[in-house]
Curated annotation (Swiss-Prot):
Gene Ontology, cellular component aspect: cytoplasm
Keywords: Cytoplasm, Methyltransferase, rRNA processing, S-adenosyl-L-methionine, Transferase
Free-text function comment from the UniProt entry: Specifically methylates the guanine in position 1835 (m2G1835) of 23S rRNA.
Assigned protein family: Belongs to the methyltransferase superfamily. RlmG family.
Gene3D superfamilies, A to Z: Vaccinia Virus protein VP39 (3.40.50.150)
HAMAP family to which the protein is assigned, alphabetical: 23SrRNA_methyltr_G
Cellular compartment(s): Cytoplasm
Catalyzed reaction equations: guanosine(1835) in 23S rRNA + S-adenosyl-L-methionine = N(2)-methylguanosine(1835) in 23S rRNA + S-adenosyl-L-homocysteine + H(+)
GO molecular function: 23S rRNA (guanine(1835)-N(2))-methyltransferase activity; nucleic acid binding
Short name of any one Pfam family annotated for the protein: MTS
Name of this protein: Ribosomal RNA large subunit methyltransferase G
Length: 369
């Protein structure tokens, strides 16, 4: 466990999933700067994209209500974990997506998301539903701030001014303007490889083209059995391909991004009736019993928010091994340099290469009988 000191108060914070001995912190310099310099008045605060609940824990006190919105299922788990660790009982309403509230917040605190389209979409919603002039504070590490961020904030906020940098982090102050970006909430494009229309919410990768890793795995799916899991489904391209290749299959599509699962649901409904698939918002496969799947397809992430890590991939591999029937297969794609073959060999006892490109490798392991 690690400790963050804010105004003489010490918070105990953990990342999620928790990995004992992991040196990575559950907060960064932008979180600490926001908690000490946000300058928002007393009253209800709306918090967006708080990775592990550090902002919520730091702003919590009995007289304040917090509205907390995060697309990430793991962020919700991290928040619950850290509220409990710090014995915080502040009134707090949690949702995966922005929704109308009976009261208006006195201010909005936004942790800069990895996808700038998500920030634009969030500011559009806030400008549409909350009063003009509501204070907004955006917190980010300088290395995470793209060159297009100043233009975006000036277009959608009034009175925009950045703070001085502290420990390589910065705050951007502004006020809701009532203006809109003109960006569609859901974008759609025709995927030639699947011959179907794909729709995407802003926080989903592959908004106008196939993810390169998914493209390689699509070309090397192999035989599709009856019970398939698409682990980390994203927009659902692997699920769609599985259903197209075996009309009798049933696909369980899982992702920790709420917007990914909503995108996947829309896309699957275009190709099959609901009895052939189920889409779940969750962390890996922790919610299902073992020995149910014939095949797990996986294109695992190698980052959590802005941090490079293989912890999530390892969790996915362990869950895949647990839920596969004896003789069931895990087929996955990953960057060659990540060395996933060693992890699969350790877990399954073997691993074989199905295909490789200069950047990606498709690997398969079979659960022993």
């Amino acid at each position: 466990m690690q400790h963050l000191n804010i105004h003489g108060h010490t918070l105990t914070l953990r990342r999620f999933p928790h990995k004992p001995g992991c040196p990575l912190q559950a907060w960064d310099a932008a979180d600490a700067l926001a908690l000490t310099n946000h300058a928002l008045p007393d009253g209800e605060i709306l918090i967006l994209n708080d990775h592990f609940g550090a902002l919520a824990c730091g702003l919590a006190y009995p007289e304040r209500t917090l509205e907390w919105v995060n697309d990430s299922y793991m962020a919700h788990q991290a928040l619950a974990q850290n509220l409990q660790l710090n014995r915080i009982e502040t009134p707090l309403h949690r949702t995966p997506a922005l929704a109308a509230s009976p009261t208006n917040p006195v201010g909005i605190l936004i942790k800069l998301p990895r996808m700038l389209q998500l920030l634009s979409s969030q500011l559009d919603w806030l400008n549409l539903h909350l009063p003009k002039g509501t204070p907004v504070v955006i917190a980010a590490r300088q290395k995470d701030m793209p060159s297009t961020l100043p233009d975006l904030t000036r277009r959608l906020l009034d009175d925009v001014h950045p703070s001085r940098a502290e420990k390589k982090a910065r705050l951007i102050f502004g006020q809701l303007s009532g203006r809109q970006s003109g960006q569609a909430e859901i974008t759609a494009w025709h995927c030639a490889e699947l011959d179907c229309l794909l729709s995407h919410y802003p926080n989903v990768f592959g908004r106008q083209k196939l993810d390169l890793g998914a493209r390689v795995l699509l070309q090397n799916l192999g035989t599709i059995p009856d019970q398939v899991v698409d682990l980390g489904c994203g927009n659902g391209v692997l699920s769609i391909a599985a259903l197209q290749r075996n009309p009798n299959s049933h696909v369980l599509a899982v992702d920790e991004s709420w917007q990914a699962t909503r995108s996947c649901q829309i896309n699957l409904e275009r190709v099959r009736t609901p009895e052939h698939f189920k889409v779940v918002w969750g962390h890996s496969l922790s919610f299902i019993e073992g020995m149910q799947a014939d095949l797990v397809l996986c294109n695992p992430p190698f980052h959590q928010h802005q941090t490079l890590t293989d912890d999530i991939a390892w969790c996915m591999f362990k869950d895949a091994h647990r839920v596969l029937k004896p003789g069931g297969r895990l087929r996955m794609v990953g960057n060659r340099h990540l060395g996933y073959h060693a992890k699969l060999h350790k877990l399954f006892g073997h691993c074989r290469s199905i295909a490789a490109t200069p950047k990606f490798v498709v690997l398969e392991s079979v659960k022993s009988s």
